[in-house]
Regions:
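Conserved PLP-anchoring active-site segment centered on the Schiff-base-forming lysine
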Residues: 70-124
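Helix C-cap/helix->beta junction micro-motif
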Residues: 101, 159-160, 318
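Hydrophobic/aromatic ligand-binding patch that stacks against planar heteroaromatic rings
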Residues: 96-98, 156, 197, 245
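Active-site phosphate-binding strand-loop segment of PLP-dependent enzymes
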Residues: 113-200, 205-207, 212, 307
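Conserved PLP-binding active-site segment in aminotransferase class I/II-type PLP enzymes
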Residues: 1-75, 79, 140, 158, ...
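PLP-dependent aminotransferase class I/II
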Residues: 2-3, 41-48, 56-59, 119, ...
Length: 383
């Protein structure tokens, strides 16, 4: 066994089941009643409970957040050859469903919020309007739980009469001006992947106040099967429904969401208190309008003395997990030929954040001793 393997592993963000065993109780109920299927009481209840929690009229539980984005795009009519304006600084799962629909992504740079820049979004609309084109949808992301500047973005979308889809995969529990992110746009998306603030092991949820769109998404997610005795399909469907077992985990996790948010915020505040005095190190930006869930605590460096890779390697040597900021979509080889809109004459805001940023371990099972170890390793690089 190596020295590194003997050290306690500190994770970036791993699954955290409730101490009360809520998840296990719902799973055992599913086994006892033989609801081992991609439908059932847990699925129905999870949809209702999540909708009530975030304050929307309807929700559909799906196999992933990616599936939810896909069906959101389909629900607003995105199809072959359509243009979709998409936040550049994000994980690829935000953009990939655009291609599933045969549509064309145009990537929009970030601003000081780390999220989509409204001025750049406006520039994109003006550019494509001059070419006689208009996007079929806009996808905004609430990166790492930080709310995007929704008022400004929604105003632009209303001006051009284009639907807004919120990728709130990372921001369940984040509030924009007191209201849950993911509930402002035409449709919102949440993810319950294993590293998210609550998990179903894998899964997602599509939410909206447009009950017809959610009804249609549920139909597509169930192989677009018609409500007749025999198997009939008038539309292309998908196998996207969430398992009743996974939904049981989600129901249990939802009961400890407030605890998880509180711990994530505690971790962020701990890092802020113990690292902010280091020259050239800043915590991720929180705006006045924002009450983030702090899913991941991120930093950005403005010093030549220490690079993000130095911190990653130093933490790795102590068996501590960290990772770079998402690599922007316009820098991804698959998307290199797509249009990218920025206000910068050279480079971009998203690329700068990627080059200088870093995600610190933000696991809700971390102890104060773990946090002290992380900060000690980082401070050691400053000498």
């Amino acid at each position: 066994m190596t020295t590194n393997e003997q050290k306690k592993r500190i994770y970036l963000s791993s699954p955290h089941m409730s101490a009360e065993g809520y998840e296990k109780a719902f799973i055992e109920e599913a086994f006892a009643t033989n609801w081992i299927a991609p439908l059932g009481p847990n699925v129905d209840s999870f949809e209702r409970e999540l909708a009530e929690r975030v304050g929307v009229k309807a929700a559909v539980a799906l196999s992933s957040g990616t599936a939810a984005i896909h069906l959101a795009l389909k629900a607003v009519g995105v199809g072959q050859g359509d243009i979709v304006f998409c936040q550049d600084l994000t994980f690829s799962a935000t953009a990939n469903p655009i291609r599933y629909q045969g549509a064309i992504p145009v990537f929009i740079d970030s601003d000081h919020t780390w999220n989509m820049c409204p001025k750049t979004l406006k520039k994109a609309f003006e550019k494509y309007e001059a070419m006689g084109q208009k996007p079929k949808a806009v996808i905004v992301v609430h990166l790492y739980g930080l709310s995007a500047d929704l008022d400004a973005i929604m105003e632009i979308c209303r001006e051009y009469d284009v639907p807004l889809i919120e990728d709130a995969a990372e921001s369940l529990g984040s509030l924009y001006k007191g209201k849950q992110t993911g509930t402002f746009g035409d449709l919102g998306v949440f993810s319950f992947n294993g590293n998210k603030i609550i998990t179903t092991s894998g899964g997602g949820m599509l939410v909206s106040n447009d009950e017809e769109k959610i009804k249609k998404a549920r139909y597509w997610a169930t192989q677009a099967r018609e409500p007749v005795r025999y198997y009939e399909h008038k539309d292309l469907g998908f196998n996207y429904r969430m398992s009743n077992i996974c939904a049981g985990i989600g129901r249990g996790q939802l009961r400890v969401l407030d605890e998880r948010i509180a711990k994530k915020k505690y971790i962020f505040d701990y890092y802020k208190e113990h690292l902010s005095d280091l020259e050239g190190l800043e915590m991720m930006p929180i705006q006045d309008y924002d009450d983030p869930n702090c899913w991941l605590s991120c930093i950005i460096l403005s010093t030549d003395r220490v690079k993000p890779t130095d911190i990653i390697e130093a933490l790795e040597a102590e068996n501590i997990e960290s990772r770079p900021i998402w690599k922007p979509m316009h820098l991804q080889p698959y998307y290199q030929n797509c249009d990218f809109i920025t206000l910068q004459e050279q480079g971009s805001v998203s690329e700068d954040i990627f080059n200088r940023g870093l995600c610190l371990p933000s696991d809700t099972k971390m102890t104060d001793e773990d946090l002290a170890k992380v900060t000690m390793v980082i401070r050691g690089l400053w000498g």
